[in-house]
Amino acid sequence: MNGMTRREHQIFDIDKILEILEKSKVVHIGMVDGDEPYVVPMNYGYTYENEKLTIWLHGATTGRKLDIIRKNPKVFFEMECDLVPFDCDVACKYGLSYSSLMGKGIATIIENSEEKQKALSILMKTQVDMDFEFNEKLASVVGIIKIEVSEFTAKHRPLPSK
């Protein structure tokens, strides 16, 4: 990805990046539908294995999002956490402290029941930090999207020192 403008805010420590993935609960998925941008907020799960980030999404088994991915599987994602607004005596110095993660990857619609069950377990572990098992019947009524992330960057904007 292109270099970050405020490089002093960039996070390189993978443990801090994984913390953003744990704390955030919604990911915004950007797609292109023909010549029109389309962004959807979604709950997610993730795995980070062998230095490879994978994001798992669930939703309906039909709809615009899946239609777009079938035509163009390239996606962009963004998530944030630790949002803390701050004020100042000058309007232009008001702001927001946060941590964020964004990147791009290739989305695949998962049809295999075992992989869907695994994805649902990962998603629930990420969202509520509990282990759940899913069966074929439950997996059959849910659409699963797997994003194999090719690039990502993370950022932390701290609270200003007073």
Each PLM stretch: what is its role?
Residues 60, 64-87, 94:
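Helix-adjacent hinge/juxtasegments
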Residues 11-13, 23-28, 127-130:
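Short Pro/Gly-enriched beta-strand edge/turn motifs at strand-loop
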Residues 28, 56, 76, 104, ...:
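Beta-strand secondary-structure signal
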Residues 24-61:
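Short beta-strand segments
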